[in-house]
Amino acid sequence: MSIVLFLIVFILLSLIVSRYLYSVALNVPSKIDVVFNPIEKLIYQLIGTKLEHMSGKTYIKHFLLFNGLMGGLSFVLLLIQQWLFLNPNHNLNQSVSLAFNTMASFLTNTNLQHYAGETDLSYLTQMCVITFLMFTSAASGYAVCIAMLRRLTGMTDVIGNFYQDITRFIVRVLIPFALIISLFLISQGTPQTLKGNLVIETLSGVKQTIAYGPMASLESIKHLGTNGGGFLGANSSTPFENPTYWSNYAEALSMMLIPGSLVFLFGRMLKTKLQIHPHAIMIFVAMFVMFIGFLVTCLYFEFAGNPVLHHLGIAGGNMEGKETRFGIGLSALFTTITTAFTTGTVNNMHDSLTPLGGMVPMVLMMLNAVFGGEGVGLMNMLIYVMLTVFICSLMIGKTPSYLGMKIEGKEMKLIALSFLVHPLLILVFSALAFIVPGASDALTNPQFHGVSQVLYEFTSSSANNGSGFEGLGDNTVFWNISTGIVMLLARYIPIVLQILIVSSLVNKKTYQQHTQDVPINNLFFSSVLIIFIILLSGLTFLPDLMLGPIGEQLLLHA
């Protein structure tokens, strides 16, 4: 019942926040301008930008330039952190390969971690690299999504200004929301301090080091920005990062809030601020139905437990790798949310999930469109929508069109490329991991689960998720460089292609939609969309899943 109430709260808050995002995205005057306008003007002056409208190519150029600059500075800081201030625990510099991986990970909103924050980062890099990139990577994804929606919905004749979009989103959304979440987490017991690690003497007389630091400020944006990287190596399974039952719900809801709101924002941009277009509601329904299906699947297999243990007379569900304060139910919920919304934070160890329970987060990342991350999740779903409309139109002998814009050969080539990037990166690099000498030495499990570890690592990297089957010994040159490359390619190639798709569509003459066109405003469309998503991904990844989690499940029952 608590999960049902939680999901109802998610839907209601998404509806409310989407109205606020409408005002932010379209520069609608509001009473709070008196607070935020001076801050934004100061930022524009500091970075020396003029608020001129950009073309699609200019927008993407500045998006890539801004990200490249942030990545370069972050990379340097990680290489010299031991010689800088705010390093009370005297942590050393990261190696070149690890610094590259960390930079690529947080720059792309992935937050894959091949390090433990308490031993491999100073407080300076935790704040000025990790937390900073959590804000800017989330804002970058939001900005390109809003630029895409502006042109797609015909709300404006221009794509907007990249620097204005990220500034308004950070100042008006991320910072205020993150501040509220931080204060709540502090009230629950999450530390926020610049003091060094605490050394205590236990009851048995042994000295123990307790790692803490500026955690609450990182935890809030970690979830709100669908980032996922933890201050500590064990992430949100630790009592400091996620102290209570209520903090667990707050962190889960934070992950879902903005991606869910963006779908309704799309509907408001198609209609009015106070009304949501039925097409966006049908997209939300499709996403939500798939989310519920995967959640129920994960819950079922985790509560079913391990058949090998059952044969030994040990009954009960699968509690391995889970915190007793959360149990199986909240662990499965968190697992499904963190991979559906491509956050990557964990409150339990995914490597300890049952084979088919662990396949749920893997498949959600393979789909990469069940809500997804900040901005890019909706962009990915719109690619599936266009594919569905195109195929359905051809099946009934109609000219493929979307929102009154014809989908022709040029657009379909770009759509196909955008769709293929994700599976190609996963499958090619997974194959390389078994071919390159020494790469498979990182595997800690033989047979099917070893395949699952490799597949999960590259799926997580390509989906900009960041969670992992952490039995993999991944802090090696091969794994640092290969996953770093995957994260960068999977982030930037689809975004560029998706902006090109929309730019191509809006340059066409729009026409009045007819009743003979494929209907996109009813539950039938939602059903067909779900079927196409499952079929396309199933045909792509099923052979690999047979070699991994499905094979492992069959082995348990052998």
Swiss-Prot record:
Pfam families: KdpA (PF03814). GO terms for cellular component: membrane raft; plasma membrane. GO terms for molecular function: P-type potassium transmembrane transporter activity; potassium ion binding. It comes from the Bacteria. Belongs to the KdpA family. HAMAP family: KdpA. Part of the high-affinity ATP-driven potassium transport (or Kdp) system, which catalyzes the hydrolysis of ATP coupled with the electrogenic transport of potassium into the cytoplasm. This subunit binds the extracellular potassium ions and delivers the ions to the membrane domain of KdpB through an intramembrane tunnel. The system is composed of three essential subunits: KdpA, KdpB and KdpC. This is Potassium-transporting ATPase potassium-binding subunit 2. It comes from Staphylococcus aureus (strain N315). The lineage of its organism: Bacteria, Bacillati, Bacillota, Bacilli, Bacillales.
